[in-house]
Amino acid sequence: MNFYRDATWVLEDIEKEAAKERISGSMQTLVLKSCKRYKLKSNPKHIYAVLDSCWKYKPYLEKVMKKAHILEDIPKKKGKPLFSRLTLLLLCHDLLLSKQKRIQMGKHPIKDYVLKFKSPLHSEMVKLKLKLKVRELSELVLSEDISNDLPPVRWIRINPLKCHPNGETEPVLAELRKKFTLKVDKWSELVPGSIYYDEFIPNLFGIHPSDKITAHELYKHGKIIIQDRASCFPAHILNPGPSDIVIDSCSAPGNKTTHTASYIYPEPPKDNNTRIYAFEKDPERAKVLQKMIKIAGCSPNISVNVGDFTKLATPEKYKDVTCFIVDPSCSGSGIFGRKFFDSFNRRKIDDKDDDGGIVPDEQEEFIAKEELQTRLAKLSSFQFQMVKHAMSFPAAKKIVYSTCSIHAEENERVVIDLLLDKSVREWGWKVAPKREVIPSWPRRGKVEEFEEVFRDGVTYDPQQLAEGCIRALPKSDGGIGFFAVCFERD
């Protein structure tokens, strides 16, 4: 009974919030907030799983309960019902819609009461399904639920490293056209079976998120790679050539690394010369990185190094490196579609681990602002150190810094801190102009962030600095939220 009591309290909060004109936060946020407020002992994951399902089916359950007259005969004590309407809703949900189709509690008066109505409840549920012309109620809510959790576009890029013999992409594109027969002019026009040719990134295409691609032979053989469009920005901005040597400082899972390789090797490489050094601190993530590199067909040309980039890579050891991609751990606030359970399993920021962690953006509603700012400050300090370390390499001429964060603390303000740093100025680094950073992309950096620091416009032009940065909004711009800036040396 303890679980249903706890879940009822949380459901009461959700119902109150839903009655407002504007709901503050998601279901995940509301569940976590209530669990914290009441100091509940029940597992928040379990509460969320039940309430998420119960809330979706609530209108149907209420109709069934009304028809079965279960709310009319509730026993009373001193004129008040003994059983809560919402607790009964939860029990009816588990009896009718849970996987086990049973109430998860021992002997209790409320359980006995609900089981008295078992037959009429089942009967009314069958009638409702017949009336709605469905076999299961899930048919009515599944499509909406899935669409809310999917990206607006599934982006795929052709991998020239697997396009034999000369990196020709046309045969792969011809195969894609067989599956996706309708070409659309805008990604927002995508429907199942259609394809969009991206205007910003070469060999990148958008398909409808419901279209299955992972079973396709092109995907299995590494000829196409699923990668969000914004995630393709760093390699495209860096645009390294055959003579460049690149370090990807935080490489896993490897999409940016292999995308970078496609610029150095526009066709399958004919030698085993290492041109990219990929660093990953976490050994398990490094295994994923190695697997992705192998699938992409560039294992001989990428050296995977397991360890902290700032400690393992020294300017003396890598004195010939010319280009860097620095995409360090960030708040992840630009990522959408992450399930509630991820918030319990993500890496936390540990005082002993400068690799940072991930802070789910949806938790901002109930994590104290002071705590969030502390986390962002720690992340931005780590990000600053990562980029500054890359800037210290003697042959470095170009660095792309990126995050999947929407917070200025991790984006424009890191750029500002670097520009104000004495060593960075002495090394001759500056923000690359707009013409070198996907100039046709419409959404640029926040000029107001630069105006706060460079008001005089003499040291740096705030407008030019903002235009040298790229931002992408979650979903609105066709994918994840993202930030990218390119530094180049005078």
UniProtKB/Swiss-Prot annotation:
It is found in: Nucleus, Nucleolus. Its EC number is 2.1.1.311. Disruption phenotype: Altered structural conformation of the ribosome in close proximity to cytosine 2278 (m5C2278) in 25S rRNA, leading to impaired translational fidelity, and promote recruitment of a distinct subset of oxidative stress-responsive mRNAs into polysomes. S-adenosyl-L-methionine binds at C250, S251, A252, P253, G254, N255, K256, E280, D308, D327. The active site is at C404. Its main location: nucleus. One of its GO terms (cellular component) is nucleus. The keyword Ribonucleoprotein does not apply. Keywords: Methyltransferase, Nucleus, RNA-binding, rRNA processing, S-adenosyl-L-methionine, Transferase. It is an enzyme of class 2 (transferase). One of its GO terms (molecular function) is rRNA (cytosine-C5-)-methyltransferase activity. Interacts with TRM112. Present with 922 molecules/cell in log phase SD medium. S-adenosyl-L-methionine-dependent methyltransferase that specifically methylates the C(5) position of cytosine 2278 (m5C2278) in 25S rRNA. Loss of m5C2278 in 25S rRNA results in anisomycin hypersensitivity. Belongs to the class I-like SAM-binding methyltransferase superfamily. RsmB/NOP family. This is 25S rRNA (cytosine(2278)-C(5))-methyltransferase. It comes from Saccharomyces cerevisiae (strain ATCC 204508 / S288c).
